Amino acid sequence: MRRFFENVPENLWRSYEWQIQNRIKTLKEIKKYLKLLPEEEEGIKRTQGLYPFAITPYYLSLINPEDPKDPIRLQAIPRVVEVDEKVQSAGEPDALKEEGDIPGLTHRYPDRVLLNVTTFCAVYCRHCMRKRIFSQGERARTKEEIDTMIDYIKRHEEIRDVLISGGEPLSLSLEKLEYLLSRLREIKHVEIIRFGTRLPVLAPQRFFNDKLLDILEKYSPIWINTHFNHPNEITEYAEEAVDRLLRRGIPVNNQTVLLKGVNDDPEVMLKLFRKLLRIKVKPQYLFHCDPIKGAVHFRTTIDKGLEIMRYLRGRLSGFGIPTYAVDLPGGKGKVPLLPNYVKKRKGNKFWFESFTGEVVEYEVTEVWEP
């Protein structure tokens, strides 16, 4: 289904370039498609200088115009709460302290580094952890800036894993993308290259380009971390994009963010993860929403996340259950969270809660040692 765009020829609809060139970016444009709520209209007006708005025709087509609480709509259309100081005072622009001495480079964990290579996004998601960069304009890192990042990685031989993010890293020109990957592959201690991309969700047409896939395959091993938040985002186009990546030997993992009003429902999450497994995408993380200024209204309680994790157990295969994690403030790293299944302990005896809620006694006898 191509809601709103039924008259667009299929060859154009399948064009990534057409999707980007025809993004809806103004109040006047979006009102052609949606009857905006007062808080949305005011939100678009008041966020433009701070948190700009843009949405691809493809992602817009997934919105049910009759539902003001549509989960795609909530992720893509600004609301005035984003600039409500009373609400957003609990957040920080850079709560995870990503900014360092080298622009765009974050070296938090000893063996891996994050490269933010562009501020451009196909869609400016309203819950984005990097909303602070929205107002910087749409620009990619220059080759000189990339070279500075590469030199840093060369000097730090403990780095074996490079995560390329943004903005949207796979929006880079093919020429610049190949330059970046070729420079990284010159470094012998770099073993893994990952992309954090939401294009399979927002503009899956990007992966209908064989030249892009040729480049990614050429510099294998490449891993894709994508970001489906709701089952409505898994369409035939998204499935085709994932399939094209997998056929090139590029694994695809998913990192979902727990968002109030979007997916803070156990049944919604179960449906999402089941659909991801069906298209061969592994649910890797369920992230608790970060305290980012401009996105605080999307946060739920930790108890809600634990409730969802408890619900998934017994209803979903183990490899389909993501790790629920909190990103600690100040760049202190991720902490995994699990419901407490140990209800009681006495010496070597434990009482565990099963997935059905039954409490079962379990005794650990002496461990034999040779």
From Swiss-Prot:
Transmembrane segments: none annotated. Residues 107-322 form the Radical SAM core domain. It is an enzyme of class 5 (isomerase). Its EC number is 5.4.3.-. CDD domains: Radical_SAM. [4Fe-4S] cluster binds at residues 121, 125, 128. Keywords: 4Fe-4S, Iron, Iron-sulfur, Isomerase, Metal-binding, Pyridoxal phosphate, S-adenosyl-L-methionine. Belongs to the radical SAM superfamily. KamA family. This is Putative L-lysine 2,3-aminomutase aq_454.
